[in-house]
Structures are given as structure tokens and as C-alpha cells.
């Protein structure tokens, strides 16, 4: 990398590029001297790279802003081009709805104001344009209130830029900035503060409790107003331009041209509730709230940090996580060395966990945060590991109130995190969970972590890791292997079923075809033993052959999948097939999930069969004590919607190729027609058309391009047919899913006249101090330590939690079918209010 590029990238950092100095002023002066000369040689390379640095290392924006201010003193044309590029990029970001670019570029423009590069009045115009758009959006008559998330986002962008230039704006244009803040207050007075209870990390049972709390926009305005009343003084934003103020004041101001905000879709003309809800969902998806604060630690763990400084550090951390997501070590390094004067390890941990647990989904996969936290623990060995451990303990204490989706992610993260540190954890602290009933959330949490660890390592290793709490071995999965029913025992005569299993195994070893196998089964086993025994023999034997490894399993399913398809052509029989798979792998949760997932992948079982099996009696009783049924259900839904997503991508790509083929075919025809219309001499006589060789080539080209276009159109039609079929099946799947949830909940939820909220449900168990029959551990019959919530109530809480989680996760696919779901499932007289509340909170949409 060129020296000038390295200087730009590493400005403000401790490193060899700037010698031993860590002073911002020295860095800026050194970089300015090099960049000034480089602009004369290759200004067209410097400008885009400088902009890229400012956008992708936004915690250094004050440094880049000051550098540009100094360049403005000597090369106004270069800076004018830069300002125009910033404006153009900002407009593109607005047009495309690129949230991160909009926010960062507005911060950058505010910083350029501090360096006397941008005219304050023109920045105020940008603010007011965004604010005007926001106010229009939430206006019932002129706008589309369903798109309030976009309006909120614009206001957040204005407020979030002020820590970087509010002082200068208050000094140079005090009336104008006051007008903007008053306008924001007016906006807040007309917008709706809708419930986001379905996106909360913790659920205390009060469905509308979040309405009484300040939301993110209101809270941010309070922080900015406190900052303004404090003279715009904060510790988290460097102000290097002050060191060059005497020089920068001589710079020429540059004007920002007007901007135009993106228009929202028109509100539904038919006043459809479902369509309005879908628009709101689309807006929330496009303009999601960046962070939901997770207050894990007590206030005394943080230094005396102003609320606005906390906000700025959160911005720094989220920016680094976003822009350096492909360079995890650089990411961790920057996160550990932010340009602030106070310690922030606790705030960093809270921010990271808020992203891991963020609902409806985090910006990145859990694995990314796992690696960043691991690197931070190594970069800050004396501080961060203890903070992370403290966060885990704090979350463990609140695990019974944690959202089910967030709880699952916490389990996945923590088990993976421990695998990076030799599975070391003071398990004796959590050994008390064995005294709790097997359905207690803390006990289930520890159990699921240990089972996940076994997947990431091996049984003996995990047993060794809990040697300080050996009793926890009870929560490990069974060490035994597959549950093969036809194993041969010495000294005992083979049963008829064992003989048939051995014969089937021999045929597999002889590599007989699936067709031959089907004929043999239909002639030998089925007529004598009937369907159930036949299915048991076939499933047990083939799975046993495939049990040696994942590759063996895949090979068996690929080679003999037709046998399963022939035996189980409909959903009823596929449910029985899944039950047999579960029986064979009853000692291995992971292999059960893998086998079922592969069978669905090969279309041996349908997603509807999996839903029916998950909600069958053998699994329903496990809903509150094991994650296995939910994992399998989630895998099936994921695979279903991944297929739809893949089909949509294929259709999009083929559509583009069709347009290209159309153009190529049209051009070929035009060229042929032009050639045919020309006169040429053949043996001295004028003939219509060019020479025969060229004409033959042109005709061949027309034929080939026409065939290519036709082939693509046929492929497009086939994909569209598959998509329509998949969407039709999805509607049936969703109806089955919600009907299944409704059915099992109806059987166990208390009378709706007595229980109308989750808090009511929890209070039932809390009021009853005496252990009931359900408070006895069914494994050994001994009474367990009392739990705040009884088993039946905990089953209801867990099932409602997963109902909310699945509804929220697949909301985009649910909305197109909302009217049918409302009419056929949600509107029945016997629908329990807790069932409707779970779905309403997930969709952020009231159900009546």
C-alpha cells in the first residue's frame, strides 16, 4: 500500500507510521504534508480513498474533517469536488435507503462544518429537509404513517450528528439550530409511540408496558438537550480542529446543494388493516432500529459517563462492527482503542450482547460476534474476560424472562465461546440447578449449553470440564450410541425381524438397487408383517448402516431414498417415519436433527409432516424441557423459506438474462434484415442481399439467439411455476403451524377469564407455595426444590415464547397470508387472548 494511503488509514493510531507521537495535531500535520503533495500528482486517487476512509472508519471523522479543512486552505478546487462527492453519495444513499451511509455522511458533513468547509446554513437546510420529510410521513392526511420508521430514522440521523458539531452550530447559527430542535419536538408530538414489546429482550408480562417508556428517539432527544444545556461539552468526540482554529478560519465555505428525500409508497386505498401492517413491517425491515439497549450491569460499574457519551461510544462500537466485519482482528483492535478518555469495557460488553440478542435479528451471524469477543478477550486479558463472565452471570439470573429467540442465541454463543477457551467455566456456581425442577429455565439453560458443547467437542472432554461440579453430568446427553433394535445377542436365536434386518443389510452391502430393494420389501416383509413393522425394520436398518458418519448417512439417503418415498408417500406415514428416526437417534439430539434435515432436503419428508410430528404427543410434553423439537421445527421452516428465497433469486437472474437475450435476438434480426435489404452483385447480376456466406452466418445467429431466448423464457416459466407452487404450499404450512400452536395451547392454557396476560400466568405459580404432583421430578420421583412457576405454567410460557419467536422470524412470509390467517385461525371465539398477544407482539400489529 502506498505511504500516503497508510498515513490516511492509520491517522490517530499508535504505530510506526507516525513514530512515537500519539498527538492528534502531530498526526494531522504529518498527514497533511504528504497528502497535499500527493494531490498534485494523483488527486483523482486521493479523493475517493479519503472519502472511503471517512465513511468506513467513522470514529476518525473529526481527524479527517480537520485534515480536509487544512487542504481547503491550499486547494479549494479539490475540496469543492470532495464536498460535491459527499453530497452526491448522500443523495444516492437517500434514494436507496442505505441507512448506514445516510447516518455516517450526515455526521461527516457536520464535522466538515467544524473545519470551516461547509456553510452552516446549508447544513441546516439538509436538517430541515429531512425533518420536513419526517413530519409529512407521519401526517395522516398528507403522508403514510405506516412508514414512521423511515421518519424516525431521519430524525435520529439529525440528532445523532449533533455531538460532532452541535457546539459550532449553536455558536454560528443559534436560532436555526434551536428551530431544528423545536421542530423535532413538534414531530415527536404528532408521531405515534407504538408498542415494540415483541422486540424487547426481556418480557415481564405487561403487553403494553413499553408504551409508558421513552422510545429510542425520545431518549436521544433528551440526551441532546442535556448536552446543549451543558454547553455542548462531551468527552467522547475529539475536537482536533480547535488546534488549527486560527488557520481554518481563513478557509472558504462550500455550499451543499439541496437534497431530496425518498418518497414512501402510497397508503392503502382500501384501508386494509393487513396491508397497512405489511407496509409498517416493510418500513421496519428497511429502517431497523440500530440498537436496543441491554442494561446488564449496575450503574456503578460504569464510570461517571454522560448519557450522550454513552450514546457516542455505542455509535463507535456499532460502526466498527459494521464496517470491519470482514477483518475481525482489526475490528477487535479498533474496538479496544476508541478515541475516548474513559474506560468503557462494561459498555462494550453490553453493546456486543445487545447485538447478539437483537430482535428480530442481529446485523451479523452469531459466529462473528463470537470471534470478536474472543479477540477482545485476548487483546484485553486483564479486563474484558471478567466483564464478559459478569455479563453471562447477569443474563443467567434473568434467563426466565429472556425472549426465547434471544435465549437460543445466548446458548449458541456461550457454548461456542467456551469451546474457544478449553470449556473452562466455574460450573460449581450453577450446580444448584440440579435442585430445581427439570422444567426450570435455569436448569434447561445449563442443560442446553452442555449438550451444545458435546456437539462442539466430545462427551468425555465435556465431562472432564465439569469436574468441579460432577453432579452436572446428569444434564449431559446420554453417552450411548444409536438405539438399534435388531442388534444380535450371543447365545440367543435370531428373531424373524432380526433375520429380515440382516437380510436387508446384506442387500445394501451387495449394492442392490433401490428398485430391487422395494420389490423385495413388498414381496417379503409387507404382506406378512404389515406397514408398521416393515417401516421399523427398514428405517432402523438403513439408519444403522448410515450411522458411522455424516457421509454414510448422506450416501444411504441418496442411494435408498426411493425406498422411504415408496413406503411413506403421504404426510401421515411420513410422521411415522420421523418418529422412527427419532427413536433410532433418541440418544443423540444432533443426529436426529441432521437426519431429519437431510431427509427434508431429499424431499423424503415434507415440511407439513415435520410440523405435525413436532406437535405430536411424544414431542409436546418436551416443549419446556428440551430445545430439540424447536430446533427441528426451525430447521424445517428455514429450509422452506430458503427454497423460496433461492427461487426468487433464480427468477431475478433469469429475468435479467432474458432481457439480455431479447436484446441480442433483436439486434441479430435487425442485422439480418439490413443485410437482406442490400443489393449485391452475384456473377455480374444485381441480387437482393449480401454474399451467401455472410447471409448464412447471420441467419444462423438469428436462430441461435432466438433459441437461447426461448430456452430462457421456458426456464423462467418453470421457475415461476415452482415459486407459485411453493408459495401455495407455504400458505398451507402457515395455517397448519398456527393451528397446531393453537391446538396444543388451548388444551393447557388456563381459563381466559382468569388469565389475560403473561404476568397473570406467572403469578399462578408464584401464589402456590405447595409442590403439586407436577412439581415432582418424573425421572426419580423425588420432590424438587420449589420453582416460582409450576410445570404447566412453564410449558405455556415456553410454548408462547416460541410462538412469538417463529412469528417474528418469518413475519415477511406471514404478512402476504395475513387476511386468511385472521379469518381462519385468529378470529375464532375460542382463541385464547394469550395466543393472540403472542402473535400481536411479534408482528407489532393488533389482533382482535
Curated annotation (Swiss-Prot):
* Pfam families reported in the protein's UniProt record: MIF4G (PF02854), MIF4G_like (PF09088), MIF4G_like_2 (PF09090)
Region (Disordered): which ranges? 767-786
Q: Where in the cell is it found?
A: Nucleus; Cytoplasm
The organism's superkingdom is given as Eukaryota
Report the function annotation for this chain.
Component of the cap-binding complex (CBC), which binds cotranscriptionally to the 5'-cap of pre-mRNAs and is involved in various processes such as pre-mRNA splicing and RNA-mediated gene silencing (RNAi) by microRNAs (miRNAs). The CBC complex is involved in miRNA-mediated RNA interference and is required for primary miRNA processing. In the CBC complex, ABH1/CBP80 does not bind directly capped RNAs (m7GpppG-capped RNA) but is required to stabilize the movement of the N-terminal loop of CBP20 and lock the CBC into a high affinity cap-binding state with the cap structure.
Name the family the entry cites.
Belongs to the NCBP1 family.
Please give the name of this protein. Answer: Nuclear cap-binding protein subunit 1
Q: Which organism is it from?
A: Arabidopsis thaliana
Native organism taxonomy: Eukaryota, Viridiplantae, Streptophyta, Embryophyta, Tracheophyta
